[in-house]
A protein has these predicted regions:
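P-loop NTP-binding core
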Residues: 1-173
């Protein structure tokens, strides 16, 4: 069974992307089948995984808008894991998906139903609580929340934990 982990925090610069790439690489070196999903419009996880954005036919942006399938979007990295790449245009998905209907938050979860051959799916989230992050939280069964060792970071962590709990309650309930 695939384990889906969202690496998330509403704050930027806390190590989400670095954690996601390093975890994907370590799991890949252990022989696990890993899919890294880059949901951040900055696309740092894509670039950091060695993927040339210029040569991409599709990205997670087109997949979320159902213009292509998950399989058409996945690219293999030289680091031993697959990548669902991002691009700057992904910021547009926030506009195109937000406010449409509640199903917009389930698009990633639905797409991942075809990714059962992976041992792990790791989702690098943007530093915001938006439709992209909500898609990750809905799709994930576990969460890694990197935080800085400071008071305000812990306050933000409590808020994020509450958001995750409410999302899971609405999915299961």
């Amino acid at each position: 069974m695939t384990k889906t982990i969202a690496v998330t925090n509403q704050k930027g610069g806390v190590g989400k992307t670095t954690t996601t790439i390093n975890l994907a690489s370590a799991l890949g070196q252990e022989g696990k089948k890993v899919l890294l999903i880059d949901l951040d419009p900055q696309a740092n996880a894509t670039v950091g995984s060695g993927i040339d954005r210029a040569g991409l036919s599709f990205t997670v942006y087109q997949m979320l808008l159902e213009r292509c399938s998950l399989a058409e979007t996945i690219v293999s990295s030289e680091s031993g894991f697959d990548v669902l790449p991002a691009e700057a245009g992904l910021a547009g998905a926030q506009v195109e998906l937000t406010g449409e209907d509640e199903g917009d938050n389930y698009k990633l979860k639905a797409a991942l139903e075809t990714a059962t051959h992976y041992d792990f799916v790791l989702i690098d989230c943007p530093p915001a609580l938006n439709v992209l992050t909500l898609n990750a939280l809905v799709a994930a069964d576990s969460y890694l929340i990197p935080v800085q060792c400071e008071y305000y970071a812990l306050e933000g962590l409590a808020g994020l934990e509450d958001t995750i709990r409410r999302i899971k309650d609405s999915i299961n309930g």
